[in-house]
Amino acid sequence: MNYVGLGLIIVLSCLWLGSNASDTDDPLLVQLPQGKLRGRDNGSYYSYESIPYAEPPTGDLRFEAPEPYKQKWSDIFDATKTPVACLQWDQFTPGANKLVGEEDCLTVSVYKPKNSKRNSFPVVAHIHGGAFMFGAAWQNGHENVMREGKFILVKISYRLGPLGFVSTGDRDLPGNYGLKDQRLALKWIKQNIASFGGEPQNVLLVGHSAGGASVHLQMLREDFGQLARAAFSFSGNALDPWVIQKGARGRAFELGRNVGCESAEDSTSLKKCLKSKPASELVTAVRKFLIFSYVPFAPFSPVLEPSDAPDAIITQDPRDVIKSGKFGQVPWAVSYVTEDGGYNAALLLKERKSGIVIDDLNERWLELAPYLLFYRDTKTKKDMDDYSRKIKQEYIGNQRFDIESYSELQRLFTDILFKNSTQESLDLHRKYGKSPAYAYVYDNPAEKGIAQVLANRTDYDFGTVHGDDYFLIFENFVRDVEMRPDEQIISRNFINMLADFASSDNGSLKYGECDFKDNVGSEKFQLLAIYIDGCQNRQHVEFP
């Protein structure tokens, strides 16, 4: 026997087994079809950031449905880099130049708790908000949820503004590229999350504001149940008037004129010209659609696509889709806060040298209201004026627009932009849905939130504004104060709520000591009220 040869074989075998064992035992190394990636140890959790799920949406792939990422990694992929924002004209960037991000941005980031008691975790997939125009995956934090250690979190980046939503309403330039990005990311999660210790059968899709509306739109695909077990829309749903808008074709050609494509006569030539322009030029042109400040806040947003559009997300009015029953029949929850409209109204209290912005409404209400409240493309000029006068009289009466009447104006914004459409969505789901439909209203003002930032003032009590609940789950830069003791309890309750919802076998939902009541088949709305020191189930004929 050749003992030298046998010994060499044994040594090499041990080296091979040892190297593979170390890869297996190293939680920072993850094997994917593309190759291996290395994450970061953050003490209480592991992170794997900026993982591409789609080919870069640049060049010929701009204004196209995303293509799955195909590249193989010859070296270990570095998954320790903070995800870049998708290219945008950002409302919250100070100064005149608000251009932020990169066109090549389609990544997911995975965050996994350290928990020796579990071999696998349910998964919460997160779609960030930002009116479909701005925002980034990194802007919503993960320290709170990782501290609790209940689920794996996956943050999704998707195309925004004109790069994500410009549309001519035909198959040449159908739009909704950002929504198609989200859907491809969900497929990536389904196929790959087990490699990180996630449970692909227990995925909950969540989002806030435009993220919440995105969740609802994704759910309206009949096969959504193949991608997620449940869905949660915080302060945003498919029926909000700022979500699916009309007039997209006109804005697409206006964008073309603004960037030197004025000779384009049809969708094909417009698309070709827009593809030839620098991405930064297209996104910077957003400012030409704003009549003042960042109004309207969503000039480019989801549209109804033609039925022959490639990989169409939605081709019918969401109301008709829900009535048909042909949508993802999974448990769904929706929410609003008592002054959600503070996000949209607060900038009107910003002070200038010439006075407060709200003063302008006294002379320009008929001009500005259709942009502020998103009915400029749905009514004739006469009907717009009549409606503007009607809602002013209903909410403001004969008062002037000023700081004294601001609370009534904020209530108008809350009702029209959030609450009324939340009620309508829930009403449709309770009548035509087969899976549980839940709702909550939150009333517990934060010491600092989005309204104080936009108004640049702390001397006004805005109430419970857009994000005051959600930012207790996923931290946000607009809230730079410590949580109060009551908010710490609420934060834990929210996080436990999501963890349980992600893995619930029967679709039940619970917050703290309160079980949500299902709205499907109920004559009255079942609404869970969440406030500073508890929760309570309430029944309503109409939302309070």
Curated annotation (Swiss-Prot):
Its EC number is 3.1.1.1. It is found in: Secreted. Keywords: Disulfide bond, Glycoprotein, Hydrolase, Secreted, Serine esterase, Signal. Changing I356T: In strain: F-775F. The active site is at S209 (acyl-ester intermediate), H466 (charge relay system). It comes from the Eukaryota. Changing S120T: In strain: DPF-2 and 521S. Belongs to the type-B carboxylesterase/lipase family. Transferred from the ejaculatory bulbs of males to the female genitals upon copulation, plays an important role in the reproductive biology. Changing I10T: In strain: 178.7, 357F, 517S, Bar-F-77F, Bar-F-79F, Bar-F-96S, DPF-13, DPF-30, DPF-82.1, EM-10, F-274F, F-517F, F-1461S, MA-4.4 and Zim-F-H31. One of its GO terms (molecular function) is serine hydrolase activity. Monomer. Changing T268A: In strain: 174F, 178.7, 357F, 517S, 709.6, Bar-F-7F, Bar-F-77F, Bar-F-79F, Bar-F-93F, Bar-F-96S, Bar-S-24F, Bar-S-60F, Bar-S-78F, Bar-S-89F, Bar-S-99F, Bar-S-95F, DPF-13, DPF-30, DPF-46, DPF-77, DPF-82.1, EM-10, F-96S, F-274F, F-517F, F-531F, S-549S, F-611F, F-775F, F-1461S, MA-4.2, S-114S, S-2588S, VC-815, Ven-S-1F, Ven-S-2F, Ven-S-3F, Ven-S-4F, Ven-S-11F, Ven-S-21F, Zim-F-H27, Zim-F-H31, Zim-F-S11, Zim-F-S18, Zim-F-S53, Zim-S-S34 and Zim-S-44F. Residues 1-21 form the signal peptide. It catalyses: a carboxylic ester + H2O = an alcohol + a carboxylate + H(+). Changing E394D: In strain: Ven-S-13F and Zim-F-S18. This is Esterase-6. Changing T58I: In strain: 178.7, 357F, 517S, Bar-F-77F, Bar-F-79F, Bar-F-96S, DPF-13, DPF-30, DPF-82.1, EM-10, F-274F, F-1461S, MA-4.2, VC-805, Ven-S-1F, Ven-S-2F, Ven-S-3F, Ven-S-11F, Ven-S-21F, Zim-F-H31, Zim-F-S18 and Zim-S-S10. GO terms for biological process: courtship behavior; mating; ovulation; pheromone biosynthetic process; regulation of egg-laying behavior; regulation of female receptivity, post-mating; response to odorant; sexual reproduction. Changing N258D: In strain: 178.7, 357F, 517S, 709.6, Bar-F-7F, Bar-F-77F, Bar-F-79F, Bar-F-93F, Bar-F-96S, DPF-13, DPF-30, DPF-46, DPF-77, DPF-82.1, EM-10, F-96S, F-274F, F-517F, F-531F, F-611F, F-775F, F-1461S, MA-4.2, Zim-F-H27, Zim-F-H31, Zim-F-S11, Zim-F-S18 and Zim-F-S53. Changing Y371H: In strain: F-775F.
